[in-house]
Amino acid sequence: MAARPMLVVALLCAAAAAATAQQATNVRATYHYYRPAQNNWDLGAPAVSAYCATWDASKPLSWRSKYGWTAFCGPAGAHGQASCGKCLQVTNPATGAQITARIVDQCANGGLDLDWDTVFTKIDTNGIGYQQGHLNVNYQFVDCRD
């Protein structure tokens, strides 16, 4: 019977570790001009050519336009196809501004590449990110509520 409480404790610790692994702080976030509205929220449009288009381009317009777009290559969370369509709550800790963004692409900068129109400008409320060419943000994976 003593083994059962130990198992419960072990499972709780594992769950806490998994939850912690789905967020990161002080992550470099650059910007990219996906221009989703100008491209009819089409992930496969030549001007967009998002990595996740293979799996998500045929999703309904309401799904593709529900959140702003981001490329993801952050230090915590799944990468590649496994990250496609997932949502991140991205916070600018300098201002407290936050927004939910959908992962539609991959990147190579070790962080995020936020769409200029739908994400970056919404959390760069003091203009410092534009001046520096990037923001340092916090992110966590959240339920997209689709």
Swiss-Prot record:
Keywords tagged on the record: Antimicrobial, Disulfide bond, Fungicide, Hydrolase, Hypersensitive response, Nuclease, Pathogenesis-related protein, Plant defense, Pyrrolidone carboxylic acid, Signal
Record-listed E.C. numbers: 3.1.-.-
Residue ranges of domain Barwin in the record: 22-146
GO biological process, one term: defense response to fungus
Top-tier EC class: hydrolase
Entries under Gene3D superfamilies matching the protein: RlpA-like domain
Record-listed Pyrrolidone carboxylic acid modification sites: 22
Effect of substituting residue 32 to L: Loss of antifungal activity. Reduces ribonuclease activity 62%. Reduces ribonuclease activity 92%
Induction (UniProt): Up-regulated by fungal infection, salicylic acid (SA), benzo (1,2,3) thiodiazole-7-carbothioic acid S-methyl ester (BTH), methyl jasmonate (MeJA) and wounding.
PROSITE patterns: BARWIN_1, BARWIN_2, BARWIN_3
Segments passing through the bilayer: none
Keyword set includes Hydrolase: yes
Documented activity regulation: Inhibited by 5'-ADP.
Signal sequence, start to end: 1-21
Entry coiled-coil feature ranges: none
Disulfide bonds: 52-84, 73-107, 87-144
GO molecular function, one term: RNA nuclease activity
Complexes and interactors: Monomer.
Function: Shows antifungal activity towards B.cinerea and towards the wheat-specific pathogenic fungi F.culmorum and F.graminearum (groups 1 and 2). Has ribonuclease activity.
Official protein name in the record: Wheatwin-1
